[in-house]
Amino acid sequence: MRKAIHVNGAFGVYYSNQQACALTRGAHAEEHMKTQVCIIGGGPSGLMLSQLLHLKGIDTVVLEKHSREYVLGRIRAGVLERGFAELMREAEAGERMDAEGEIHHGFYISDNGTMRLVDVEKYSGGSSVVVYGQTELTRDLYDARARMNGKVIHNVEDVALHDLNESTPPYVTYRDGDEIVRVDCDYVIGADGFHGPSRKAIPKDVLKEYEKVYPFGWLGVLSRTKPVNPELIYARHDRGFALCSLRSQVLSRYYIQVPLSDKVEDWSDAAFWEELKKRLPEDVAARLETGPSIEKSIAPLRSFVAEPMRYGNLFLAGDAAHIVPPTGARGLNTAASDIYYLYHAMMDHYLKSDDTGLQEYSAKALARVWKAQRFSWWMTSLLHTFPGTNPYDQKLQSTDIEYLFSSEAALSSAAENYVGLPF
């Protein structure tokens, strides 16, 4: 027998034998839930892991600080490497991605007006990437969880993690109005981003953080215009970096490098388009279709890694543990490998009583994270103009680009990293 229950505005399912999830009200206006895996963070990483585990019969609760509308309103990169696309399909959430996503077989690098193609399909052994907006894939994951009555609870406040040591089961608390809700679980997944509470729950004498802050940001514009090029263009220019990207055949995304001191209000649409054209090859600039911006924002660039990615019964994933500059589109794709490792580790634990994957998670995830960090750092260093750059530095950048296109080994390395290193 089972009956529907209502938890903080999200419907779940109550099983009387308590094998999956239970909710009771305590004597002191405290609610209790029980699940196997509590996932903090309802972005694509948390939703995907929840969906994958659900399909294997492993129960989860997802806690998200913001509303669903807020999460879907975030504008993020839309280049998906092969591994992420495969995970979407395995999660039974990839149908629309496969129908509407743009398959890209390469990307262009422009060096002060000279543009050349990196044929990633050729140099990676036949792989490609999918261009599909993060907003859309998040919507698909929400829909997939809804179809299966997945428990995704929004607008949670004051999330706190407790008893993370391995000797006792952990639990998570959050505030719902005047009530405190407690979620008892076997494991906690921190997929709550850079500013979330999960990483902060690891003692400072255990956690080691590595960070590099870049002295510039990206001014991005989203517009309902035809993309200027079928494949992405990464443009190095003495005036600063530029990127021509897209979300679909009628939705374009463009970026230019700007000083950290710049504000969005400093840039009118006309000023943005004018500056973008100056950084592109003349023939590309001539065919650039301009229009009103739908969204405009400035994102600072930073590299960040936290070690370890496991502490007791807490496992970090995605931006909670690592951040990369957007150059090369590794952010969400790096999170995908975290989810892949956690998914398989949890399956082995619950279905095979094998904890090897859980024990090895941090080391395995970090090994791939640092390779993604290296590629993003290389792309950023290769294509941006740094304050204080002298003619010698500029020559080295151009020489690095020349070497890339003169060496099949270099092209193979770039292509392999762009489509995604194997999990």
What is each residue range found by the language model?
Residues 2-37, 52-56:
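Extreme N-terminal leader/targeting segments of oxidoreductases
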Residues 4-6, 10-17, 33, 286, ...:
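C-terminal helical "tail/cap" subdomain of flavin- and related membrane-associated enzymes
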Residues 40-54, 141, 295-378:
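Conserved mid-domain beta->alpha element of the FAD-binding
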Residues 54-75:
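Glycine-rich FAD pyrophosphate-binding loop
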Residues 62-63, 190, 235, 317:
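Generic enzyme active-site microenvironment
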Residues 70, 192-193, 324:
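Glycine-rich, N-terminal phosphate-binding loop of Rossmann-like dinucleotide-binding domains
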Residues 73-77, 81-148, 165:
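Active-site-adjacent segment of FAD-dependent monooxygenases/related oxidoreductases
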Residues 143, 150, 157-160, 165-297, ...:
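Conserved FAD-binding catalytic core of PHBH/FMO-like flavoproteins
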